[in-house]
Regions:
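Non-catalytic, usually N-terminal nucleic-acid engagement modules in DNA/RNA processing proteins
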Residues: 1-173, 200, 204
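Intrinsic disorder/low-complexity segments
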Residues: 171-210
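A short alpha-helix capping/helix-coil boundary motif
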Residues: 17-19, 101-104, 184, 209-211, ...
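Residue-level recognition of conserved structural "scaffold" positions that shape functional pockets
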Residues: 25, 95, 111, 183-190, ...
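Short, Lys/Arg-enriched charge-dense amphipathic segments
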Residues: 74-81, 85, 110, 160-168, ...
Length: 282
């Protein structure tokens, strides 16, 4: 934290691929590229961090291929920080083609109709293989308005999923992953058309970027009591930073501002805060 004035905060977010000045706006590179913009264009525009989409990269080209190509940074040609979402929002947006259970989200791919199951653990594993600098937990994002009991059940489920995400994340980080059986990192593995390409079939590291951080997400719809409950349970798990999710999904802008206003003070003052899915600067 560099400076505070009222509720405004000015800070720096340190990642394995550089420092981001906050507050920051993230251009969206859904499938690993920001449309109609090169990496140089983005730098010239002042972008310091890019968001990529786990759902789309998982379905095509797949996290294994991205990892084998050296991770998302090499795949995108972007040397700066990258944040990946969990893929949950896209899965939930499929409507009738998905079903939510305690295990996770079961859905059919919009590409080929194949059935997929996105669990909290799988969301962590995919993002670890992609090698982003910031990975998000899998949460349930309800469209608003929604019945109170449905919001309550969703909030509690998201808290349970957050614990499962954190447990898997810490397991991967503690496993010494980041190098393959030969001792090389994903970035050091030869590409298919390079000398030594036969060794491209050696087992891939589970973690492409050992410096990856994980953000927890506070849910709770537009209900202050449920926002407080979600914040309490998410903070009890312990993450590198915290996000406010479940907004800009159909509620009036005034309601969004109110929810942010009473949720932000519940988050630690010494940790970064991420307002998810809000694409119009206030």
């Amino acid at each position: 934290m560099l400076h505070e004035e009222g509720a405004a905060r000015r800070g720096e977010l340190a990642t394995a691929h550089g420092v981001v000045q906050t507050p920051a706006f993230m251009p969206v590179g859904t499938r690993g590229a920001v449309k109609a913009a090169t990496a140089r264009d983005l730098r010239d525009c002042g972008a310091e961090i890019i968001l990529a989409n786990t759902y789309h990269l998982w379905l095509r080209p797949g996290e294994d291929l991205v990892s084998r190509l050296g991770g998302l940074h090499r795949f995108m040609g972007w040397e700066g920080p990258i944040l990946t979402d969990s893929g949950g929002f896209q899965a939930f947006s499929l409507g009738a083609r998905r079903a939510v259970t305690e295990d996770g989200v079961r859905f059919r791919s919009h590409l080929d109709g194949s059935e997929r199951l996105l669990t909290p653990e799988r969301a962590v594993e995919i993002q670890a293989a992609l090698g982003s600098d910031i990975a998000m937990v899998l949460d349930e994002c309800l469209a608003q308005p929604a019945p109170l009991e449905q919001v309550r059940e969703s909030t509690e489920r998201s808290a349970r999923w957050a614990r499962r995400c954190r447990d898997r994340f810490l397991q991967l980080q503690a496993s010494g992953a980041g190098t393959s059986r030969s001792g090389r990192t994903a970035a050091e593995l030869p590409l298919a058309d390079s000398p030594g390409a036969a060794s491209v079939f050696e087992p891939l590291p589970l973690v492409t970027n050992p410096g990856q951080a994980q953000f927890g997400i506070v849910q709770g719809g537009t209900v202050p009591a449920l926002r407080a409950l979600s914040a309490e349970r998410t903070l009890a798990i312990g993450f590198e930073a915290y996000a406010i999710g479940g907004l800009s999904v159909g509620e009036p802008a005034e309601t969004m501002y109110e929810v942010v206003g009473h949720t932000a003070p519940l988050l630690p003052a010494n940790r970064p805060r991420y307002l998810m899915g809000v694409g119009t600067p206030a």
